Amino acid sequence: MCVCQTMEVGQYGKNASRAGDRGVLLEPFIHQVGGHSSMMRYDDHTVCKPLISREQRFYESLPPEMKEFTPEYKGVVSVCFEGDSDGYINLVAYPYVESETVEQDDTTEREQPRRKHSRRSLHRSGSGSDHKEEKASLSLETSESSQEAKSPKVELHSHSEVPFQMLDGNSGLSSEKISHNPWSLRCHKQQLSRMRSESKDRKLYKFLLLENVVHHFKYPCVLDLKMGTRQHGDDASAEKAARQMRKCEQSTSATLGVRVCGMQVYQLDTGHYLCRNKYYGRGLSIEGFRNALYQYLHNGLDLRRDLFEPILSKLRGLKAVLERQASYRFYSSSLLVIYDGKECRAESCLDRRSEMRLKHLDMVLPEVASSCGPSTSPSNTSPEAGPSSQPKVDVRMIDFAHSTFKGFRDDPTVHDGPDRGYVFGLENLISIMEQMRDENQ
């Protein structure tokens, strides 16, 4: 069974940033744009999420050629929580200890033996220098609904100095500017509420440790895409399957094999992140999806034309890999597309200046030079060394709680060929981006 070693949780109080020699105080992952489980920041290079056994086994069984397109799996931790006298909750991660008797529902599963993961040190691996925008200590109280009003207060130990603004349904900016992606905060509150409701029976929770795929980026622009024409797993109840099929039929999942599940994009003109959530994505038409993709690639001043080829190259590479994965199905899986919002190449700045001159807006040129100039210098967090290199982009598959393949966990349903629904979504995403590139050359 899982045990917490040494110290009690909560004894460090609401202002704790570390939880002793063994425990690590978890913080909400401020760049979560989609999903329903709360992602937590473990250290600069690692995030964690509530463990789902099927997803854990899937990460352990990944084909080698898929690993380029998925977060690195780093193991498991035990997570404890306890409210202090002021009503704040601390989530603390400890080494996961596996004994001979494991209190799990899946102990009888027959599959490939689990890899034995060394219990990694739970000290922070960095001081936060990779994310200079993160500051310490922000307190928020849950008060958005009667449900949340009863929840304990949430202590957020890190936040971004770059504000996040949610776009409402009419494409207007919300008035609220906060230091976390709104979806991240929502998921965190819901996760704490669920854990608190179960606390009478269970004090320990297993979390997966995964690579923080945005840690290379200073101002990560993230697009979360729900991929495929089908979202329900083979083991879904008839009710859930029907519900998921309706969502697909009423969205671009049916027509394109992909829909927007969330996004954040950094705006150079305002210095804010603009955010969209899954409800926005579900209501998009095909043209609306195109517009959302355009908005994701626009920094408030220009369309980032320099991103087309690097992203397309990644997407084509992923498509080629998945076409070789016979029997694999990635139901309800998402695809993250990531780039750095503060990166501005010299040629892009020159293009912008030329356009400005043609429009006789020479007075604006000093501002453009100012906004583009500083970011052409090497960044401590960006691997890009100069203006001649391609911008850093990344494409990663996430969320494998409903994935399957032949021989996996003795799943009774075995599928033939690759995941055609997922590949269909990639084909359409590639086609739309190619059209957008050609129209904006």
UniProtKB/Swiss-Prot annotation:
InterPro entries: IPK, IPK_sf. Keywords: ATP-binding, Cytoplasm, Kinase, Nucleotide-binding, Nucleus, Phosphoprotein, Transferase. It holds the Pfam family IPK. Residues 113-123 have a biased composition (Basic residues). Transmembrane segments: none annotated. One of its GO terms (molecular function) is ATP binding. The keyword Hydrolase does not apply. Converts inositol hexakisphosphate (InsP6) to diphosphoinositol pentakisphosphate (InsP7/PP-InsP5). Converts 1,3,4,5,6-pentakisphosphate (InsP5) to PP-InsP4. This is Inositol hexakisphosphate kinase 1. The lineage of its organism: Eukaryota, Metazoa, Chordata, Craniata, Vertebrata.
